[in-house]
Amino acid sequence: MNTSNRLLNERLKELLEKIYPDLPAEDLAHSVLEIFWPGDINPRKRARTPSNRLWSERDGLLITYGDTLLDGQHKPLDLLQDFLARYIDGFLNGVHILPFFPFSSDDGFAVTDYSAVNPQLGEWSDIARIADRFHLMSDLVLNHVSSQGNWFNEYRQGNAPYDQFFYEGNPDDDLSDVVRPRTTPLLQKVETRYGDRHVWCSFSHDQIDLNFDNPEVLLEMLRIIRMHIDNGVRILRLDAVAFIWKKPGTTCIHLSETHAIVQLLRLLCDYTFETVVLLTETNVPRAENLSYFGNRKEAHAVYNFPLPPLILHAMQSGTARYLHDWQASMPPAQLGCAYLNFTASHDGIGMRPVEGLLPPEERDRMIATALDAGALVSMRALPNGTEAPYELNCSLFDVMRRSFKSVDDHHF
């Protein structure tokens, strides 16, 4: 690539100095540029000017797994492409295909190989064909990888560069303030060529957290992003991005280095000729979620996480008071930024986003009503040793068959 873009180089070095103050920013910046614009590919001469031309009220996304449609004869991605062309084209212009890589658990979010499409679904050419017709969203699962993948196997064997790819903790460290999305132990002891190690597992013990202290991890993620873009992905969902940087003795969520990494990704995307939108998946209270706009320097879009639980509460309780109060208090998105409104997702309905919006007794009544309708609730560990509801795991239509007062006789 042509590395003569002074503004891009200078801004990139500024961010890398924030993330890796003890490493040579000039060398790192050169590596970043060579990875993101390899060979004869070059960035734009100027960054894309912030505007709202990237989306409008007419944009809509279908969320689906790659194998939602099966017939025993065709590849699932072939079936999905046919379904989209027949029934969705003209009504929705985007599709979010949940992780389509080989995986070991968590419905795709424990990736074993980032470079391949799950052969049970199809191949990269199938992804590219869907992207030719729709705005395609993919998941960048960047906080963790599968314990059964090649990267972690190489780590356990002590083979470079993977021997430095995973975040190791010490049971004696002060981890009391770490914000958790799960109740499982944070550290997992594993056997390696050099003895036992304790690796960090923010989610499950099959999902081992990557070590972004090592710039090679960031560079590898940039290679993966480039591969997504080259195959037609135009919306990058940054899965669990809030947890990627760790510092014992802190909350280990939303740290300044995390925000600097999101800013770096935004910078690179704004210099691509392809129109790439960054969407952060931050299932947290409102102010924390909005921080990922970063004054127009971070995400192009954030999920409007309070919307699903507040809609559910309004339907169950018969009052839109809390939904209305929240809507009235929401700041408009800044120029070049947007809220992604949604009613439910593969993750369920988050409870953290209504902290400070629903009184605890209203939240608890909503949860109890959902449980009566057959929902499940996943919990998260709190620093004081107790647990709190994290997500309602349910179908939106099923959970709405009960209200605070009775069963809905007209439910279908």
Outline where the language-model segments fall.
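Active-site and adjacent substrate-binding regions of carbohydrate-active enzymes
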Residues: 2-412
